[in-house]
Amino acid sequence: MKKLTTLNYGFPVLFAVLIGSCNTEPVLTENNANARGKEYYLQLGQKLENPYAVKNMRKALDSVKSKMKFSKSAKNTSEFDIETSHLYVKIEPKNADEEAVLKRDTSQVFFDYPLDYEFPEEVLQQMGTNDAESISTYYVAVPKEYVFPAGIKTEVLEELYIPEQDPYFDDVTETGQVNKSTIGTKEDLLGSLLIEAFKLTNNEKELGLESWTAGKSSWWMFGSKWRPSGKITMFDNSLNKVVPVEGAQILIRQWFTVDSGITDVNGNFSTGTVRGQARYIIQWERQHYDIRNGWFGQAETRGPSKKKESWNYTITDVDDIQYAMIHRAAHHYYYKDIKELRRPPFDSEMPSRMKIAAIHDLPNGLNGDTSFWRGLAGVLPTIRIYKRNNCHEYYGTTIHELAHASHWKMGWWTFQSVEDKVKESWARGVQWELTRMVYPIYTNEYFGDYTGVVQDMIDKDYSIGDNVTGYNIRQIENALMYQKTWNDWKNKIKQDYENTTENNLDQLFS
């Protein structure tokens, strides 16, 4: 929360701007010949042969028809053919406006890494570009009829056929068994097609197949549809207990099939149904905010690949704790009770969603900062939250920075000329008020421009001689609107609200 010095983060020269809050000195991004391009990580992964490619599905169907018999009861299935159902698309927004328009469609899940690659876990943790002039490249599988927003550059990487999403198989009666030699039902056809496609592309192990024989007949224990579910918690070292992570977006991914669920107040979630093995992923974003892994990569916590198993997970990794704590505070400010305060900017009110960078470095006198000009450029995050030792520190810092964002939203055309003492004292007050809703004994440190004036107007503690009480946080926020100076804010409070202790405001604001 102190002043920043000029920093070199290895980015090309983009701009030098004044940080909107928590800092008064320019942050200059400097040229670095080692900047990574958007596709830098492709060379660190292994491209997989795609079983869902139309060309491979057609080969699989031809193989099934040549090797297996079709029973009389399944005569119609022998006429089944493969047609493109989905498109695997690479998307390259050229600016933040295009990125925001793209991501406004919450029916699609966009990944900043390709879906037909296998990456080591350590590479996935560092995914993204560090080139400040680049918007991330995104990958998605969409129905073939899907229309992308006009003007955004897209490239179809592969035509897909995803049988699990084909209405032809909606009426399958599931037994979990697939006959090895005869197509007698739609379930036999679906299972045989998938098994053959995965075999032809050397992905058979992903199906986790088991064989079963009875007399002259043999079956694959293919498995029926199942609904992924689980519970996400974390150890909160400030509360000294395991707590649920509410409001987190959980993805279940099986190649190009992606479904999602949101954790409830107890951390429980469930998603749509899948068949076979699928990977659980926590993608740390919601409609209005997007937590970044450092400056640019999407923050994710990658869970295991499971088949008919729930994922009950307690977060312990230090980076994942950082993501989870930023999320908990952001989710509170955007979606939960905030005592009638105004929310931070929604996705429709900025060029892109509120980007919050989880900076994994230990702070050098800085807990976090907010730059609206940096965020308005769209490429860089509006907010940065640095590594902390305790969970309540993450929470309070995130609330503080989002309070600046909400203040900016109240009157962005005047915000830059508001006195630092007003900005920081207000954000410090919101930090105290909202953080105590989760950490009841939370206390703030006050110094310089970071005064305790908001707390003093609310609490009944007269021990430090403030002698003001009885105001609420919404009243103080209402009086803050459009006020630029310390005295203007004080006078607006006096003007708008009657209070038996208001005669002591002059002393408090002195």
Where are these regions (language model features)?
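Long, solvent-exposed N-terminal ectodomains/accessory regions
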Residues: 25-176
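Short, ordered, surface-exposed loop/turn motifs in non-cytosolic proteins
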Residues: 54, 61, 71, 227-228, ...
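Short pre-active-site segment immediately N-terminal to the catalytic Zn-binding motif
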Residues: 382-398, 417
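Pan-zinc metallopeptidase signature
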Residues: 44-81, 85, 449-510
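Auxiliary, metal-adjacent structural segments of Zn-dependent hydrolase domains
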Residues: 322-388
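Post-HExxH zinc-binding segment in Zn-dependent metallohydrolases
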Residues: 417-456
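Short, acidic Ser/Thr/Gly-rich low-complexity loop/linker segments typical of extracellular
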Residues: 254-268
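Active-site recognition of the HExxH zinc-binding catalytic motif
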Residues: 396-412, 424-428, 432
